[in-house]
Design a protein with these regions (language model features):
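Alpha-helix/helix-capping structural signal
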Residues: 6-7, 38, 113, 131
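Short, flexible loop segments at the rims of nucleotide/cofactor-binding pockets, characterized by
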Residues: 10-11, 82-88
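Amphipathic coiled-coil/heptad-repeat helices and related helical stalk/stem segments
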Residues: 18-19, 91-92, 111
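PIN-domain endoribonuclease scaffold, especially VapC-family toxins
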Residues: 25-82
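Acidic, PIN/NYN-like endoribonuclease modules and their adjacent C-terminal/linker elements
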Residues: 86, 93, 100-106, 112-138
Length: 138
């Protein structure tokens, strides 16, 4: 499973929400999070923004600890193939490329519409965090 940056930020900002539940499920080993270097860098850059730190009530050090924990439970994905351009938002391309190269079966994002039908061509289902948690519970 690949989680978009918006899901990582939501997990950091709201530890009781569906996004954080996805990370807890990964920590329990029930799902595998896939992450590439470009996606990890985006996680770090976005989570480190003052706006998100303040909303989460975390210090810079605590944000780094959170990100280290996410990376520790993720499986690294090497990007062998670039599939650009595929999506409306060029910023989403690295998320799709991580999912395709990592052979993910799911991509979790709050921006489902931005990915359109492209991930389905690669056998990847796109869903919001709440939907992902619902499927994991089945």
């Amino acid at each position: 499973m690949v989680v978009d940056t918006d899901v990582i930020v939501a997990a950091m900002r709201s530890p009781s929400g569906a996004s954080a539940a996805i990370l807890r499920t990964a920590r329990q080993g029930r799902i595998t999070l896939l992450v590439s270097v470009p996606l990890a860098m985006e996680y770090e850059a976005t989570c480190s923004e003052a706006e998100h730190q303040l909303a989460a009530g975390l210090t810079e050090r605590e944000v780094q600890i959170f990100l280290d924990a996410v990376m520790a439970m993720a499986e690294p994905v090497k990007i062998h193939f670039l599939w650009r351009p595929q999506l409306r938002d060029p910023g989403d391309e690295m998320v799709l490329e991580t999912a395709v190269n990592g052979r993910a079966d799911a991509l979790v994002t709050f921006n489902v519409r931005d990915f359109g039908t492209v991930p389905a061509r690669f056998g990847i289902e796109v869903m919001i965090p709440r939907e992902a948690i619902g499927r994991m519970r089945r």
